[in-house]
Amino acid sequence: MKGTTIRSRLNPKLEVSVIAGHFATRHSHNNHYIDITRMKHEHTMAREAAVTLAQRYAYEKGVDTIVCLDGSEVLGAFLARHLAKNTLFAVNSDKNINVITPEYDSNGQLLFRDNLIPMVASRNVLLLISTVCLLYTS
């Protein structure tokens, strides 16, 4: 499918494809699909996305753990690297940031094994989600 390419205003190296059509999931019906596959899985695109995302958190928000959902582990690893960079006034400078992925139980609920619970319990957690569904009524 051919889509329209949209570039980020914050980082012109970041781009996504938007495809018009009818896309149905178990929970929603959408008129457009935003393809962020390249952003999640390509080295250079994931790095650029992480640099851009890190700008929002580097100087204001402490992050102990990044929880990666929807296949966003590559992006999460780059994000942790950029958040922990040793820069002036960075909140997470030289910090060891955990990057984890939960499991799912048979009902589709998130499950953190015993060895991961200390990384999320009473911690500053950043959820990295690559699935968004916008619902509204007119």
Residue ranges and their predicted role:
Residues 1-138:
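PRPP-associated nucleotide enzymes
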